[in-house]
């Protein structure tokens, strides 16, 4: 009888070696079985995996192992999203080349992932910084360019004068570069763009087909695409107030019904009217410059104080030339949305109301609730943006907002200003073309050449890849490619004269927008093998963080359409199923206050309970430290747990089991030492129960019981098998864990009976059948333990290669039913009884219940109402 504790340090490497030696997880494209493609968002090689990685990749691995067992040909690959800023920062700070830093990190993280026992097809591995990968990306760029999906234009950018690079809007914090802290400048640069807006309507409409995506993600993408139907209205300007030659300003609005509530117009700092006004007024010029520096990210616009400056320009109301409104430059109006000009209706929009109150502008209610009194309805601190009827709107009074929209649109479409209609209906999208130019070294080179005679010339495909020169220096800010003495100088492919390479590299989001396609045939000379891509795609289950809900997923959807347009794939949508997992979070620990606060790692802390109160003690000094909030694990607050430490102490299976067990997978899981220890105790319990009975289990063939002593354990095993199948299908891993705990509890006594030699052959055979089911159930989550237990009970081959067991329908039929029992209509008890019990048996059993006896107090009920298979009501 085996009684040794399970030793993951011995077992886990052994099984990992066996899987690898047998190429168990390598996938063949010509396998005739139904395909299943499961993919977790590939990692950036930062150097170490964290517990978030462990949770993400464990979830994907459970799906892969389960689907493999269910008979699918599973593709479960891994690669590295390897270009990007951190490698260049490391080069500047540590004097190490980005390539060296990146590939060293890949080697470290790959070793860590292998220790987790993931069933990955490593034969398809690549990094996006491999020339073999970005050669095919350059090929795609040239195909998109030929198809008209890529173009260049002058674009306003956020320029960091210290780092000498373009910053995304999100990287501008209160007007300063997120890294350098320098005041950001606005510059006009020629940038490369992908025409994602060509697909705006399709990207929006197709969201309705993605029924295996979270509704939250679909809504986020819908809002980001931002389709709106409105009216472009031309407002005549009072010529006496205009500093330049402009005679009118066009405003796009989705609420023309509120025109009579307008009290101001607001324009972007980059609007031609603003530039004209700024040229003649230093105060306006300074304000416009402040707006440009502040950043134009959604977060910046929504959180910044709403400010404006009166330009002195006056616009005439479209329905009343005697009514003039002031034109402000405002920091919340963007030049690249609509026309860069809006009208403000303070009564119907909170932002406009705040602005109007600040600058003492009129607030006229124009929509009120249907049951309100127009004589008394007013606007206080909050704008009214609900449905209702029009008031204070002349010929619109009494109409609904929808009717007023149509009335205004119809009138203005038929009203002429300077010989053309004053308004036209427009559909606008918030989505903008994707600017991919980055003034960085560590990215995919853009494969074009600039010739003074021929203009922009694509690099011939035969000359791809355009590789990054290795001999660059990072001793000064800016793009090393601009400074390279030879790399940028090249002969023009068309005329042969001296020319220059493009020194911008591609946004790293490009690299991750098609990698899932490359995994289908990473050895192919072209970007894809269309046959393989069309076979494997779409990805059946994609798993990753909610933070990628918009950009990465939207860009990938665009890329798939662009690749279809250029003949590389035959589908539109890359991901059939999407799952966004929660984070791994942990308590924070600290000592000191304010600027003196010092964060302390969990490894330095011992948590004690004194008089029912938890307290944290610094192990080395013995001093009590503050227990803070539970937050996402982060290096800055040091509330991180190193997966290597956990796996080293408890084994990979314990870590895997814990991150799946505590919370629904789409919610955060709180890391706790007690939780990990609990998972480890369960691992040891399963091992002990099975190995103590293993010798006798090996001596019999597995056979479920149809009656007798073994029936209960067979029913428990087969019912659990059916339920866990459904849980795995729905990615409800925490529910599967709970059921497996229950099954082990149900099996404990029979296993002990077998181990002690007190079970007959029929019971032993039933227990072996249940044990085989249990091992198969835990195999996706705890694959090493499953292999070890399978070997112990005499199983043949690898669990990783075994088909999923089938439940016996006869054993999952519930022979009993639980009925709620009411007394005078209020539930007082539950009755468990045979499903086929007749009315008389049910009544007798009900009368024997303690709650019913107490209510009757020795008497008889007036009547007992039995609703078959549903409920019992006792009337007393």
Curated annotation (Swiss-Prot):
It is found in: Cytoplasm. GO terms for cellular component: cytosol. ATP binds at residue 635. Pfam families: Anticodon_1, tRNA-synt_1, tRNA-synt_1_2, tRNA-synt_1g. CDD domains: Anticodon_Ia_Leu_BEm, LeuRS_core. It catalyses: tRNA(Leu) + L-leucine + ATP = L-leucyl-tRNA(Leu) + AMP + diphosphate. Signal peptide: none annotated. Its EC number is 6.1.1.4. Its main location: cytoplasm. It comes from the Bacteria. The gene is leuS. A motif ('KMSKS' region) lies at residues 632-636. InterPro entries: aa-tRNA-synth_I_CS, aa-tRNA-synth_Ia, Leu-tRNA-ligase, Leu_tRNA-synth_edit, M/V/L/I-tRNA-synth_anticd-bd, Methionyl/Leucyl_tRNA_Synth, Rossmann-like_a/b/a_fold, tRNAsynth_Ia_anticodon-bd. GO terms for biological process: leucyl-tRNA aminoacylation. It comes from Rhizobium meliloti (strain 1021) (Ensifer meliloti). The keyword Acyltransferase does not apply. A motif ('HIGH' region) lies at residues 43-53. One of its GO terms (molecular function) is ATP binding. This is Leucine--tRNA ligase. HAMAP family: Leu_tRNA_synth_B (MF_00049_B). The lineage of its organism: Bacteria, Pseudomonadati, Pseudomonadota, Alphaproteobacteria, Hyphomicrobiales. Belongs to the class-I aminoacyl-tRNA synthetase family. Keywords: Aminoacyl-tRNA synthetase, ATP-binding, Cytoplasm, Ligase, Nucleotide-binding, Protein biosynthesis.
């Amino acid at each position: 009888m085996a009684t040794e504790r399970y030793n993951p340090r011995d077992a886990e490497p052994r099984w990992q070696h066996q899987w690898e030696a047998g190429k168990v997880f390598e996938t063949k494209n010509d396998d005739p079985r139904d395909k299943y493609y499961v993919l977790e968002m590939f990692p950036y090689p930062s150097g170490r995996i964290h517990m978030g990685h462990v949770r993400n990749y464990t979830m994907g691995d459970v799906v892969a192992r389960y689907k493999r067992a269910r008979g699918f040909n599973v593709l479960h690959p891994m690669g590295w999203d390897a270009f990007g800023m951190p490698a260049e920062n490391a080069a500047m700070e540590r004097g190490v080349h980005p390539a060296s830093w990146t590939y060293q990190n890949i080697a470290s993280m790959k070793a860590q992932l292998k220790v987790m026992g993931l069933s990955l097809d490593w034969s398809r591995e690549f990094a996006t910084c491999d020339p073999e990968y970005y050669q095919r990306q350059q090929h795609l760029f040239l195909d998109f360019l030929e198809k008209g999906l890529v173009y260049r234009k002058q674009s306003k950018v956020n320029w960091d004068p210290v780092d000498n690079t373009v910053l995304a809007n999100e990287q501008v914090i209160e007007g300063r570069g997120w890294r350098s802290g320098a005041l950001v400048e606005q510059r006009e640069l020629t940038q490369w763009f992908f025409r994602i807006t060509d697909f705006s309507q399709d990207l929006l409409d197709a969201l309705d087909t993605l029924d295996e995506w979270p509704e939250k993600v679909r809504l986020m993408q819908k809002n980001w695409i931002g389709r709106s139907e409105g009216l472009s209205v031309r407002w005549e300007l009072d010529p006496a107030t205009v500093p330049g030659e402009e005679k009118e300003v066009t405003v796009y609005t989705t609420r023309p019904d509120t025109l009579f509530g307008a009290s101001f117009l607001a324009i972007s700092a980059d609007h031609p009217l603003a530039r004209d006004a700024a040229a003649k007024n230093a105060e306006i010029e300074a304000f416009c410059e402040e707006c440009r520096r502040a950043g134009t990210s959604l977060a910046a616009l929504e959180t910044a104080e709403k400010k404006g400056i009166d330009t002195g320009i006056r616009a005439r109301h479209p329905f009343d030339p005697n009514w003039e409104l002031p034109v402000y430059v405002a920091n919340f109006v963007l030049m690249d949305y609509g026309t860069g000009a809006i009208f403000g209706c303070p009564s119907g929009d909170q932002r406009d109301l705040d602005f109007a109150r600040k600058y003492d502008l009129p607030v006229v209610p124009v929509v009120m609730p249907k049951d309100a009194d127009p004589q008394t309805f007013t606007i206080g601190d909050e704008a009214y943006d609900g449905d209702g009827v029009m008031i204070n709107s002349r010929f619109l009074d009494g109409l609904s907002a929808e009717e007023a929209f149509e009335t205004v649109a119809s009138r203005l479409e038929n009203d002429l200003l300077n010989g053309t209609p004053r308004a036209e209906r427009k559909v606008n999208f918030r989505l903008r073309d994707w600017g991919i130019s980055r003034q960085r070294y560590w990215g995919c080179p853009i494969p074009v050449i600039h010739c003074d005679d021929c203009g922009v010339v694509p690099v011939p495909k035969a000359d791809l890849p355009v590789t990054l020169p290795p001999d660059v220096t990072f001793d000064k800010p800016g793009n090393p490619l601009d400074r390279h003495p030879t790399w940028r100088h090249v002969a023009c492919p068309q005329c042969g004269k001296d020319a220059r390479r493009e020194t911008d590299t591609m946004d790293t989001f490009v690299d991750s927008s098609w990698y899932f396609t490359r995994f289908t045939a990473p050895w192919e000379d072209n970007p894809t093998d269309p046959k393989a891509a069309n076979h494997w795609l779409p990805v059946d289950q994609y798993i990753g963080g909610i933070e990628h809900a918009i950009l990465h997923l939207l860009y990938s959807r665009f890329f798939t359409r662009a690749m279809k347009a250029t003949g590389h794939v035959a589908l539109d949508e890359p991901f059939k199923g999407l799952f966004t997992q929660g984070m791994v979070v942990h308590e924070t620990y600290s000592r000191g206050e304010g600027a003196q606060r010092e964060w302390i790692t969990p490894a330095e802390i011992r948590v004690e309970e004194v008089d029912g109160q938890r307290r944290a003690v610094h192990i080395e000094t013995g001093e009590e430290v503050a227990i803070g909030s539970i937050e996402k694990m982060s290096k800055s607050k040091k509330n991180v747990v190193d997966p290597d430490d956990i796996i080293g102490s408890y084994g990979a299976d314990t870590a895997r089991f814990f991150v799946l067990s505590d919370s629904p997978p789409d919610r955060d899981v709180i890391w706790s030492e007690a939780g990990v220890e609990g998972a480890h105790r369960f691992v040891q319990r399963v091992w002990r129960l099975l190995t103590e009975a293993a010798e006798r289990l090996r001596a019999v063939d597995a056979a479920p019981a149809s009656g007798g002593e073994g029936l209960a354990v067979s029913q428990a095993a087969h019912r659990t098998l059916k339920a866990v199948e459904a849980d795995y299908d729905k990615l409800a891993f925490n529910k599967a864990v709970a059921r497996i705990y229950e099954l082990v509890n149900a099996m404990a006594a029979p296993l002990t009976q077998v181990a002690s030699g007190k079970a007959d052959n029929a019971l032993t055979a039933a227990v072996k059948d249940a044990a085989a089911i249990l091992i198969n159930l835990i195999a996706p989550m705890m694959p090493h333990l499953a292999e070890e237990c399978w070997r112990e009970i005499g199983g043949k081959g690898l669990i990783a290669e075994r088909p999923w067991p089938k439940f016996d329908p006869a054993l999952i039929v519930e022979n009993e039913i639980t009925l709620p029992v009411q007394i005078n209509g209020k539930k007082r008890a539950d009755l468990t009884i045979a499903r086929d019990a007749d009315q008389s048996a049910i009544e007798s059993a009900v009368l024997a219940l303690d709650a019913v006896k107490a209510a009757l107090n020795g008497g008889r009920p007036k009547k007992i109402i039995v609703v078959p298979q549903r409920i019992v009501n006792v009337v007393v």
